[in-house]
Structures are given as structure tokens and as C-alpha cells.
């Protein structure tokens, strides 16, 4: 089992699919990485040599922001918005939807469980 960017990559899957187990690498980036390292799409992780795994690891470390670094970067960006006091920052601070979705109904995932209102009966 190959270990890339701190993630155990499944050996029985194709390389393009297995790379997507790393947070921050989707289908397009996985295809880019395979093209840079000259690995065919049909190749499985179990068929990779140690040199190819090392090459993939170096490419990801050099060119892409993944796993903990990516999560940290996103958290810093959100904190910056909250410190600025801009509209998006205020929405994050109040734990409401940020991208213009309606909140009168829906938005239960973001707002949490419905809070009962005292004295209101049907």
C-alpha cells in the first residue's frame, strides 16, 4: 500500500482514482499528476514502481496544496473574512449560509436543529 501525502492509497484501484483519496486532489488534478509523471490511465497502484511512487509524491509536494496544509489555508481564509467584518465573514460568524441561499425555510444543515419558540402553538 503506497503512502502519499500522509494518506494510504488503495493498491487495487487505478492510479487516477486512488489519488482522489487525497484531500485536495480531484479528477482533473489526478489526471494532471499522471500526465506529468507519464503514467498511463489504466495502470493500477499495485503495478507502480517505488521510483514512480516517489515521483508522484514529489510532484504533489511541489505543485499542489493538499491535506492539512489545504485545510489550514481554508481556515485562515475564513478567519480573515470574519476579522474583516465583511458580509461573508458575518455569515460565517453567525453560522448561516454564505452564498446567498434562502434561510426563511431550509438551511437546516447550516443553522442546526430547529429551536422551539415558547408560546407558539398551532
Curated annotation (Swiss-Prot):
Q: Which PROSITE patterns match?
A: RIBOSOMAL_S13_2
**Keywords assigned:** Ribonucleoprotein, Ribosomal protein, RNA-binding, rRNA-binding, tRNA-binding
Q: Which domain of life is it from?
A: Bacteria
Task: Extract the ranges annotated as region (Disordered).
Answer: 95-122
Its GO biological process annotations read:
translation
User: What Gene Ontology terms describe where this protein resides (cellular component)?
Assistant: cytosol; small ribosomal subunit
User: Which molecular function GO terms apply here?
Assistant: rRNA binding; structural constituent of ribosome; tRNA binding
Give the quaternary structure: Part of the 30S ribosomal subunit. Forms a loose heterodimer with protein S19. Forms two bridges to the 50S subunit in the 70S ribosome.
Under the heading HAMAP family, the entry gives: Ribosomal_uS13
Q: What does this protein do?
A: Located at the top of the head of the 30S subunit, it contacts several helices of the 16S rRNA. In the 70S ribosome it contacts the 23S rRNA (bridge B1a) and protein L5 of the 50S subunit (bridge B1b), connecting the 2 subunits; these bridges are implicated in subunit movement. Contacts the tRNAs in the A and P-sites.
According to UniProt, the name of this protein is Small ribosomal subunit protein uS13
Q: What is the source species?
A: Methylocella silvestris (strain DSM 15510 / CIP 108128 / LMG 27833 / NCIMB 13906 / BL2)
Specify the taxonomic lineage. Bacteria, Pseudomonadati, Pseudomonadota, Alphaproteobacteria, Hyphomicrobiales
Gene name of the encoded protein: rpsM
Amino acid at each position: 500500500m503506497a503512502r502519499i501525502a500522509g494518506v494510504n492509497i488503495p493498491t487495487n484501484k487505478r492510479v487516477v482514482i486512488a489519488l482522489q483519496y487525497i484531500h485536495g486532489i480531484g479528477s482533473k488534478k489526478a489526471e494532471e499528476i499522471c500526465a506529468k509523471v507519464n503514467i498511463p490511465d489504466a495502470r493500477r497502484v499495485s503495478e507502480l514502481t517505488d521510483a514512480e511512487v516517489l515521483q508522484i509524491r514529489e510532484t504533489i509536494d511541489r505543485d499542489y496544496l493538499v491535506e492539512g496544509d489545504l485545510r489550514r489555508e481554508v481556515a485562515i481564509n475564513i478567519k480573515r473574512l470574519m476579522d474583516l467584518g465583511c458580509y461573508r465573514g458575518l455569515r460565517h460568524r453567525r453560522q448561516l449560509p454564505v452564498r446567498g441561499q434562502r434561510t426563511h425555510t431550509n438551511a437546516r444543515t447550516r443553522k442546526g436543529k430547529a429551536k422551539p419558540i415558547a408560546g407558539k402553538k398551532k
